[in-house]
Amino acid sequence: IYFDEMRFMLAAQMCAPNSPQWFNTGLHWAYGIDGPSQGHYYVDFETKKLVKSQSSYEHPQPHACFIQSVQDDLVNEGGIMDLWVREARLFKYGSGTGSNFSKLRGSTEGLSGGGRSSGMMSFLRIGDRAAGAIKSGGTTRRAAKMVTVDIDHPDIEEYINWKVVEEQKVAA
């Protein structure tokens, strides 16, 4: 029943799915379009297990926005550089992403191996540049990215000032 109701609502223009659905859903089923796995996962409804996709179009990403976590770690899974890879995967197929970066050390905080952290802002600038370079879904619009930071983060003032400058660029 759900399948028939969804088809009716689409045909009657009563609803429209998120952009990743418009971009990708049905391409494999209707046209046989396929591509190599890009590191996505899907839930197998028969086994109820998370399965790594073998194709980039057979089980496309279903949502326009993903909230992702990031740890205060440079290169390991769940860390800063891993986040950029995960974001690129989502941007490629038309989705946006958001994260709270409050777990990252501030620029005045020490590192376990000695020295000081380069700070949260240095990594936010990298992520901003990476997102700006990617055309979301292969189209002309740029990737959508949301950044949040807790008010008690050591670099909060620098973050707010950076956001003001970026908003002024958009307004110009």
Go through each PLM region and give its residues:
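Extended catalytic cores of very large enzyme megasubunits
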Residues: I1-A172
